[in-house]
């Protein structure tokens, strides 16, 4: 799995050594841009038991474009604050980056879809309140913890039509063009961002 993931990041395996009981030492040459955000991926692949070290080897030739993120983005459709009820119902659609009461805006990436292709969602939709009072109808809203990512991880996730917004208090992924109509026009015209 490690070799495969490094190959996708343009890494070349130089050496593979067996260092004892269920331990291997892999030495790669890889471009620095291929290693951005890789530490968390590496720890996931090794189930937290791997150790990764990096040393700058030198400048090399351009190895080509990196494979982008395969998953689509879950994009907020309007400005406002995220609501727990909406997030709870949308968790089945993908991994969420926002939690209850987080400010969101149109074009902001609020999660990752499990499949390719972006999906515009409403994370501000509250529960419909009715005058009916029946027992046992309220469902307990349990939110899965949001994924906290470093700058390097977020930069490695960016597609060509996306941007990373950095403020003193937060990091937000967003579409370069916030308005969905303008995004579609730009896609059809093929104008680079």
PLM regions and their residue ranges:
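Accessory interaction regions appended to the cores of large information-processing enzymes
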Residues: 1-193
């Amino acid at each position: 799995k490690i070799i495969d993931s490094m190959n996708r990041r343009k890494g070349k395996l130089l050496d593979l050594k067996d260092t004892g009981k269920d331990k291997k030492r892999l030495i790669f040459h890889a471009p620095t841009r291929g290693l951005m955000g890789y530490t968390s991926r590496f720890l996931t692949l090794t189930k937290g038991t791997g150790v990764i070290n990096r040393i700058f080897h030198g400048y090399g030739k351009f190895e080509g474009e990196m494979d982008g993120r395969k998953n689509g983005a879950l994009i907020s459709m309007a400005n406002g604050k995220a609501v727990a009820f909406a997030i709870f119902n949308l968790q089945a659609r993908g991994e969420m980056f926002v939690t209850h009461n987080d400010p969101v805006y149109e074009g902001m990436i609020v999660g990752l879809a499990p499949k390719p292709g972006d999906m515009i969602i409403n994370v501000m939709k509250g529960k419909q309140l009715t005058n009916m009072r029946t027992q046992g109808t309220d469902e307990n809203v349990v939110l899965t913890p949001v994924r906290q990512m470093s700058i390097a991880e977020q930069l490695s996730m960016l597609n060509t039509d996306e941007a990373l917004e950095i403020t003193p208090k937060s990091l937000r992924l967003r579409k370069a063009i916030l308005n969905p109509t303008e995004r579609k026009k730009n896609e059809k015209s093929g104008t680079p961002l």
